[in-house]
Amino acid sequence: MIQISDTAKSHFLKLIQREGVPGMGVRLSAVDPGTPRADARLEFADPSELVGDEWLIDCGDFTLYVASASVAWLDGAEIDYVTQATGSQQLIIKAPKIKGQELSQVASLVERVCWVVENEINPQLASHGGRVEVQEVSAEGVVLLRFGGGCHGCGMADVTLKQGVEKTLMDRVHGVIAVRDATDHSTGAAPYISRDFSP
């Protein structure tokens, strides 16, 4: 169920009335659901632009259309239009399921490692234009990773591996005993910090 505050409904209605298109509503969809970059998208929805499988939420004077593929990701979402302490107004969408839910301990070791890499480690590495990819997880709990982007060839990759990636995986995923780097760092085209760097 998606909750829409009265202030959000009033805000949408004003915007729709400005457009002056009969039957216009608002479409809500999830973009990149189940990933760390997931986001909710709101846009005007002209009746001729609808696919036909949208879920409809009657908001009184207009309809909110929810993309069918997004329904599960947006279940429990709240849409509000609030006045900030500064006096400015802001539309707020809270969608607690949009980025996915952490896997339980009954998930396989590989699934849990991949989840932590995608949802916790890669978002941090992205600030440097980097990422890691899981190559293999052995039955013994040794994780083999390959660095990419700004981490490929970076002079700090060893530190990132030991103090960041390995520590996070060993703390967060029961069963991981070691993390190894399978990257050939000599081939890195645009490292965040060159391996030749000396302060």
Curated annotation (Swiss-Prot):
Gene Ontology annotations of biological process type: iron-sulfur cluster assembly; protein maturation
UniProt xrefs under Pfam families: NifU
Keyword Electron transport: no
Cofactor: [4Fe-4S] cluster
Any coiled-coil regions, as ranges: none
Binding site for [4Fe-4S] cluster: C151, C154
4Fe-4S recorded as keyword: yes
Comment on bound cofactor: Binds 1 [4Fe-4S] cluster per subunit. The cluster is presumably bound at the interface of two monomers.
A GO term, aspect molecular function: 4 iron, 4 sulfur cluster binding
Domain of life: Bacteria
Keyword entries, A-Z: 4Fe-4S, Iron, Iron-sulfur, Metal-binding
Protein family according to the UniProt entry: Belongs to the NfuA family.
PANTHER family with a match to the protein in the record: FE_S BIOGENESIS PROTEIN NFUA, IRON-SULFUR CLUSTER SCAFFOLD PROTEIN NFU-RELATED
Subunit structure, as described in the record: Homodimer.
Function: Involved in iron-sulfur cluster biogenesis. Binds a 4Fe-4S cluster, can transfer this cluster to apoproteins, and thereby intervenes in the maturation of Fe/S proteins. Could also act as a scaffold/chaperone for damaged Fe/S proteins.
HAMAP family, sorted: Fe_S_biogen_NfuA
Entry protein name: Fe/S biogenesis protein NfuA
Gene source species: Xylella fastidiosa (strain Temecula1 / ATCC 700964)
Recorded name of the encoding gene: nfuA
